[in-house]
């Protein structure tokens, strides 16, 4: 009770604790507080209970639970970061096929292959690298990247070992030699292509699922994709300067293809075995993405139409409950159930829950695959990707012979030639594509508008998100289309007469192709993850990534036909082609192909803007 103004408040008897000891003048404040804590009644929940020796069990349990939760969170973070690091290392090795131009010309001169046969080898690798991508993505989404990584390591080891022995055996019988048949080399590169696809997708999917919902998803995906492009650079340098054929003066000549193939076989087998244990998807993140997607489908009303799912509210109301008969006899049953029966019941419920979660995941991923395939914008995006990657892949695979056509003499390529070494061009395209991938990934994160999922009942009439208008932003298509223009500029320069008169310009052509091609390969999977989500990313990206197989095969055949036709009409008898006619018309066709791809992407972009889909 309070007294009058200016007076100290009066103490009522109800404010006084009868259990409190009276303090003596010699008692310290700490001792007085301790006495106060022990003077509280035991029957009340008070702070004193926490300090008593008999009642600290609850506090200890809470502390242990917090420590264990923090330990699990730290363990998950270590797994997430470790998987990302090994995913980047995996991609640094998986892109070995990008160094094909390093040894492609030697297949012409050492094994007496025709240009068409060399392209058949590269096309076999390209088709086998792209066609199984959807299957590999499906396996990553439904199961785990680990088995796929082990399979990739074994396939790499077998493929490169087989290719090494085919090369060492010499020209095949139908080319005037006693070596292994040509089809064995094709089989070897089919295995290499499948392994490339599996290892690359396992690494990228792991990174996408572990970091796919963060604000830095662009750079997280760009780093392993850039590492994939860098693999051709460092591997070609190792082959050129360490695994080379020694000349009489102890200098390096051409790459020793036999040793180079064996080196790749051992390296990639090791990466695959380690990746079996290192590439892991954090379960909590994947379950969170699945649950969020299911909840969004429920809100949109689409999930209620499914024969598989009931509304979540009904499931929660029925989950863990029993019928009225069980409730009436609950007390009797509780007394009769033994501990072992309770454990069996708990295990059964846990198994049922896991089965339900697995069925939910499979249903959702299948449903999202159907949505993805039914979306016409996906086909416009894939068409543009087909028209762009075909010329890009053909340029990468035939870079070695393109460089040779610009050297008008028939001697071996040396540093003094203005067109440069094939390994130099492989390095240029690897560096420029890596820089482009990292820049576009980081810049798209910085300037792209905030993405949102677009599971709506009427996607075509859905308005734009008002939140995205609050700040200036650049769509990822604003980066994709200029990248395609850079790629077309590279082919346009190659189609002009300038490179034949100034072979040093071939370095600029390679740089432009690397910048454009690298940016496109970085942005397209990022766009897929933004528009259609990361829950089914492996399958969705795998479907789109199949299209370059047809494009690479088509433009590779066109190039080899033009090259061989020009070589047959050449006055020299070295079986090689020199001059503009070897690649000129092919380059013009590649330029127009990229321009048509830009139109296809503009159509997709227009549709996304009309829907309100933020890209």
Swiss-Prot record:
Signal peptide positions are none
Tell me, in one coarse class, where this protein mainly resides: membrane
Cellular location of this protein? Vacuole membrane
Topology relative to the lipid bilayer, per the entry, is: Multi-pass membrane protein
For the keyword Membrane, the answer is yes
Which InterPro entries does the UniProt record give? MFS (IPR011701), MFS_trans_sf (IPR036259)
A GO CC annotation recorded here is: fungal-type vacuole membrane
Q: Give TM segment ranges.
A: 84-104, 120-140, 147-167, 182-202, 218-238, 261-281, 371-391, 428-448, 477-497, 512-532, 538-558, 583-603
Give one Pfam hit by family name.
Answer: MFS_1
Q: Where is the composition biased (Basic and acidic residues)?
A: 11-20
Function description:
Probable transporter.
Family stated for the protein in its record: Belongs to the major facilitator superfamily.
State the protein's name: Probable transporter mch1
Lineage of source species: Eukaryota, Fungi, Dikarya, Ascomycota, Pezizomycotina
